């Protein structure tokens, strides 16, 4: 996914940065109007622990492609991945262009006291509120990618086997450590028992009779 993001940006970056002709207001009659994309400046990227490599590198790729410099703050809950990312960044970029800050809450708090031209945060709603609060002091634009609720609805017309297969896959992917993993199921009472039976079958089919021993079942990084 990271490589595909790099390829996508390389393929489309000229189009993304091209001037676009826009309507000229009457007060500017006889002139021509354009919009021209430009970088924000210094961008802070704060990435989460559930997909620590992907969700650090993807926004970094886009920020660099847009001409920004970046401070990247990976999660303290995935320290080995953070060390690897820091090593890679040091080998590929000068610290004036991209720098990695590791650590936990103290480092996050310190960073949010600084002025940035843009902040991209992926994580929980509680921390997202704090990021928004701190950024407002500098009127810094922010993108918040936060966790939410992802219910699944199974009614009496559903293909129960297909629904069970997809829900089990979605819930157990990365041990449920995915922002859009199903939180709960709203199931019609008339198909509840049959649906639960299909769910149990799918768990066994996808992960065996002892899921915790399955090589397809990952690790819980943060309870």
What are the roles of these predicted feature ranges?
Residues 1-19, 30:
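Long amphipathic alpha-helix in the N-terminal Rossmann-like dinucleotide-binding domain
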